[in-house]
């Protein structure tokens, strides 16, 4: 098992107590897989980099993800979450990247322009007191949080025994605590599926996984490996409609739902259990982003960014799950390396016209989703060049085509193939397509995923 040795890199209280401000080129907020990848890429580009992390260790959520499945793309081998994280921790330790651990960021404020760029001040608090870090660029890599019971408004009493799936995962894998002995899982997201298997391995009886939608929301491999292989039932178009219990959960009421996702009267049944785990969605942690003036995309609840992952606030970049929820840590790493390299280019004034959208380039296109596309990212294109587009569909479809539209004109059409909401899709948008849109005089291009009726 990988270990987390922070002896040489931790920002000790005694070393920063007398320092009010420290200057860097790039300040990365978040020490998980996104933050570490961004920091390493920025450092490789020659920037002076700092990572601010609220926990006492680097690694983020991967520290509690002890299951395999990481690294297949990035390292070409299968690793557990801690093993995957440790590889980046070791790389960070081998550099002079400054670490501020156990430090909570209070805010990000833009300063006066200096040498044609904005200087940002990141104010943080740790056991030594308040400290300010300045940077020409800031990378937001705070990750995401789980949606709670109160956010989905499950009726019933409020007994002990209701957990988010991620919290239960931490209890079992980090704290060595057993959250219950008989559980129901609401939601078939990947964390819920993984916890169904983990609970079973720990001797906790899983009464079933209940999913509101008529399809599983997790990756197909997780449905097979975590449910099918362990004989755990998956109940689609079914939800929890009441929590029963006084001091502790005693049972939950589940009901089938109709095509409008409303409970169907007469389908209620009681499932005895002492624990309810919720895997009902992830929300990017963007309170800091909003306070810094960053515009959020209503579809992703992450920042609106351009092709370099720069937000609408010059010098502030975003990557990983704080930008949009990913399926795989490997994809987070790849995206975050792009953000870190772009942040360094911005901070150092290197290659701004190529990598980071600059004023005067004459390119300003917004990208909007249509059809069954749930979102399109980036939301803005500010340079003419090969651009990677990410999107996710809102419902599964056996046959659909991706189309890029500018007004009434179709600029690009992909092959007909199936799409699933559980899989984040991406494809390269050629520079000639972007230039064509500009030649048409439009200010918006549309990424549309349109179902195709098979003959």
Where are these regions (language model features)?
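A conserved FAD-binding loop/helix module that cradles the flavin
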Residues: 319-367
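Beta1-alpha1 glycine-rich phosphate/pyrophosphate-binding loop at the start
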Residues: 24-87, 91, 179-223
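Glycine-rich dinucleotide-binding loop and its adjacent helix/turn
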Residues: 8-10, 14-16, 144-184, 188-193, ...
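A Rossmann-like FAD-binding core segment of flavoenzymes
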Residues: 87-124, 200-287, 385-418
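Surface beta-strand/loop "capping" patches
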Residues: 352-397
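FAD-site-proximal beta/loop scaffold in flavoenzymes
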Residues: 14, 140, 162-172, 275-326
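Core beta-strand elements of the Rossmann-like FAD/NAD(P) dinucleotide-binding domain
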Residues: 22-24, 128-137, 264-274
């Amino acid at each position: 098992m990988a270990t987390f040795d922070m002896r040489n890199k931790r920002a000790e209280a005694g070393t920063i107590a007398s320092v009010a401000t420290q200057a860097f080129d790039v300040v990365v907020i978040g020490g998980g897989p996104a933050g570490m990848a961004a920091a390493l890429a920025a450092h490789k580009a020659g920037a002076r980099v700092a990572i601010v992390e609220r926990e006492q260790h680097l690694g983020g959520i991967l520290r509690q993800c002890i299951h395999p499945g990481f690294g297949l793309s990035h390292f070409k081998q299968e690793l557990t979450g801690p093993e995957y994280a440790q590889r980046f921790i070791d790389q960070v330790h081998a550099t002079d990247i400054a670490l501020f651990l156990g430090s909570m960021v209070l805010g990000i404020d833009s300063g006066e322009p200096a040498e044609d760029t904005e200087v940002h001040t990141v104010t943080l608090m740790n056991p030594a007191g308040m400290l300010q870090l300045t940077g020409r660029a800031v990378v937001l890599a705070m990750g995401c949080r789980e949606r709670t019971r109160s956010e989905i408004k499950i009726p019933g009493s409020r007994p002990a025994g209701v957990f988010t799936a991620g919290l239960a995962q931490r209890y079992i894998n980090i704290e060595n605590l057993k959250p219950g002995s008989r559980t129901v899982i609401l939601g078939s997201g990947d964390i819920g599926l993984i916890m169904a298997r983990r609970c079973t391995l720990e001797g906790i009886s899983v009464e079933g996984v209940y999913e509101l939608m008529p399809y599983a929301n997790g990756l197909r491999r997780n449905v097979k490996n975590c449910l099918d292989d362990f004989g755990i039932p998956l109940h689609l178009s079914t939800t929890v409609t009441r929590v029963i219990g006084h001091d502790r959960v005693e049972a939950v009421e589940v009901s089938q739902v109709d095509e409008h996702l409303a409970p169907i009267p007469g389908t209620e049944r009681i499932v005895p259990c002492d624990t309810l785990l919720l895997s009902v969605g992830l929300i990017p942690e963007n309170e800091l982003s909003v306070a810094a003036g960053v515009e959020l995309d209503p579809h992703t609840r992450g920042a609106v960014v351009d092709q370099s992952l720069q937000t609408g606030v010059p010098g502030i970049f975003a990557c990983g799950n704080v930008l949009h929820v990913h399926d795989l840590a490997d994809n987070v790493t790849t995206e975050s390396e792009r953000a870190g390299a772009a942040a360094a280019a911005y901070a150092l004034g290197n290659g701004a016209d190529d990598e980071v959208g600059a004023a005067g380039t004459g390119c300003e296109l917004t990208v909007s989703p249509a059809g069954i596309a749930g979102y399109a990212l980036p939301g803005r294109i500010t340079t003419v060049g090969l651009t990677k587009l990410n999107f996710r569909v809102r419902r599964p479809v056996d046959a659909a085509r991706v189309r890029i539209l500018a007004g009434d004109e179709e600029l690009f059409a992909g092959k007909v193939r199936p799409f699933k909401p559980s899989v984040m899709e991406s494809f390269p948008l050629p520079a000639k397509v972007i230039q064509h849109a500009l030649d048409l005089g439009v200010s918006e291009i549309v990424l549309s995923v349109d179902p195709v009726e098979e003959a």
